[in-house]
Amino acid sequence: MAAAAPATAAVRRMKLGSQGLEVSAQGLGCMGMSAFYGPPKPEPDMVALIHHAVAAGVTLLDTSDIYGPHTNELLLGKALQGGVRDKVELATKFGIAFEDGKRDVRGDPAYVRAACEGSLRRLGVDSIDLYYQHRVDKKVPIEVTIGELKKLVEEGKIKYIGLSEASASTIRRAHAVHPITAVQLEWSLWSRDVEEDIIPTCRELGIGIVAYSPLGRGFFSAGAKLVESLSDQDFRKHIPRFQQENLEKNAEIFERVNAMAARKGCTPSQLALAWVHHQGSDVCPIPGTTKIENLNQNIGALSVKLTPEEMAELESYASTDDVRGDRYPQAMANTTWQNSETPPLSSWKAQ
């Protein structure tokens, strides 16, 4: 494996969307520090990592109330003390609830407000910079959910509104109620189905694009070896792409990316991340990590330059036909953007 491109480049700033929010061109996804990717990591180490990121210029911090649940927001609350809050753009999310041991998606006004109050309390802040609906509630017209978020903006509790895993039509309906600043979606070398409809819709409406899992949930850092190292508590063990019947074919994609990275003098993860950065000045990837060394490597991806020919070559390695398996287990796939249409506003009876 090639040496990493150094993290010498300053992390540039970018406008996210067209409503006035400015962020670092690369953010930090904080989920894996507390949840889903194995046991929670030691809190002092994670606070140090967040502080290192902010000092390096990675100031968009991304969390959600479902990470833990709640523990990731509490971690960020500790990391933001001592003047750090003023140096960051803080993004969190609502909408996935665990009730009676079952996962539910909620976007009704009372829930939206209660969730926001809970996040403000855990984060120890009086305002959230970017507040996303994490998953779309298919029982509630999107106009109703956004209407409550609009009130929270007017009250100063949140500054900007975002959506995650929303279809193009849902984005349009939401944006008509209150301008949407950002849409968060999975976008990487091997997750490109958003390019057909959602990305053009965001660009037409002046909505910023936040790419989560830009490294394929770590796959583009280590390939098949990543899967061997996962603990039993790691939800990636259940992702179809990481199952044995799909892994052999998917590993070939990684090996091709790895070989190209060696030629470019960077790591495969830097190459995969650079590909996302090259999608446009309106795109902000938010790779997650729990190690300072990997964070520095991710920042180094900002200095990896790709020609149009190299972009096309990379894309040829991971065409839709080459990628085996879905990006989510079946139980979670029913809340992705492909399943995010909501009832018409005319059907809503206020509770």
From Swiss-Prot:
Keywords: NADP, Oxidoreductase. It holds the Pfam family Aldo_ket_red. Residues 317-351 are annotated as: Disordered. Substrate binds at residue 134. Gene3D superfamilies: NADP-dependent oxidoreductase domain (3.20.20.100). NADP(+) binds at residues 213-223. Its EC number is 1.1.1.-. The active site is at 67 (proton donor). Belongs to the aldo/keto reductase family. This is Probable aldo-keto reductase 2. It comes from Oryza sativa subsp. japonica (Rice).
